[in-house]
Amino acid sequence: DVMVLFGDGAGAVVVGAGDSDDERDGGLYTHAAADGSGAWNLYLKVFDISKSPIVHYDATSKADAENQYPQMVGKKVFLHAVRNMVVATNRALERTGLTWKDIDWFVPHQANLRINEAVVEYKETPKDKALNSIMWYGNTTAATVPLTIDHWRKEGRVKKGDLILSTVFGAGFTWGSAIFRL
């Protein structure tokens, strides 16, 4: 059951040209990728609306439960997430010529703390630069990165002008990275 992993939230990060003459302001790099071969490792079955516009849910029915909740092959999702988030992080650093000395904060997608810890370990990311918030909010899917940045901004750690490297992973499989100045 994956439901214990999920939280509810929304967020956005608006990235644009910087206010200064420094060409390093704003968004420096983005990359997104997809591989549909992982679709059946993390998915939500959808009912056929053409047969019935209303879903009648029976909480005692295993068949109904499979149609209402996300399904996941955890080991495969974990391995793909770690591998692709590491690849996306490497690519971001290589394409920009930046190193961990240049990056103020690493903000991975908050799907699972073990995934984040593995990405940090394999990428040799300085642990004090890695920010997590899953312990407070759960996996809020697309909102995890903005919520994490906002959480640590309110705590006083993340500040305007900080350089952030973010890497993400999602169903299907999809993954990507971005480097931007806050």
Region spans (language model):
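Short, surface-exposed connector motifs at secondary-structure boundaries
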Residues: G97-D102
